[in-house]
């Protein structure tokens, strides 16, 4: 009887992004906790008693003492590269600093980027069932949840975060696996590209903690130009950015050159599609009868769609590729930074969620295979 009681508890929703992890309980409006998905380790020698305790820092503490630490992201392009660090971060999510709960008492909804290696999902299931002893687990695709958050059942979600950009067409609640498009170019690549431009302008950010400053500059100062060729010829007004040490830097054309990468991956020698092509090709791979509806129901999601001017630029690029008389409507929800988590919170609080998850018993009987049966 006891295991049934546990399964009736409120599920925990973890949106496991490459850059930021968002966690909270199903039924909440917004995630309770959001923190960078990295682990910090001190890079200097302790010489004083009473020095900062601990060898590993995660969450707000890692952010606060960033300059002292060497920072590593366990995830790159939506795929976990370092499982030990990933496990530590998940452990921290349940700790007294965060959700203050025991993992064995709550079912879990975990998000994942589409077209991820099966191995990644199997290993995640293994960690949650065997290390954290969760009573039930469901691994859901990020884009589907973003659509839940908008209250629609039809649309094409363009989700661009820190590690992965993908477009998923969904019709009346059915996702079309054959139409999904994904490229591994997203926010972190823009940050790296911006760091390169800043280096050319004489500002050197080389350590892992200084990379976080570049990320902050990107979020504050960068924008997407509707006509980059024209902006190159104009004198761009420089933006001033205050660094943590009190000095300022002036950023010129790199403000729009760096995010341009999302539309033109060839700028860093990548042969993949631009973000606008990812969207249009996903629609074109869908059934002909559905395309018109999908073009008029484009939903943006993820932090890399928050650049100033992103929507206008996307619209102008999609217009060039779409059939002439098709109506294009792009919806950019205000809370799109969290829309995957919000969708997860909605889904996990529905009664039907119980039919979707894999219980610990099923996992023990069938092993990692069981996790693929319930996800596509």
From Swiss-Prot:
Entries under SUPFAM superfamilies matching the protein: Actin-like ATPase domain
Chief location of this protein within or outside the cell: cytoplasm
Positions carrying N-acetylmethionine: 1
Gene Ontology terms for molecular function: ATP binding
SMART domains attached to this UniProt entry: ACTIN (SM00268)
GO terms for biological process, alphabetical: vesicle-mediated transport
Family, as annotated: Belongs to the actin family. ARP1 subfamily.
Protein name in the entry: Alpha-centractin
Organism for this UniProt entry: Homo sapiens (Human)
Lineage, broadest ranks: Eukaryota, Metazoa, Chordata, Craniata, Vertebrata
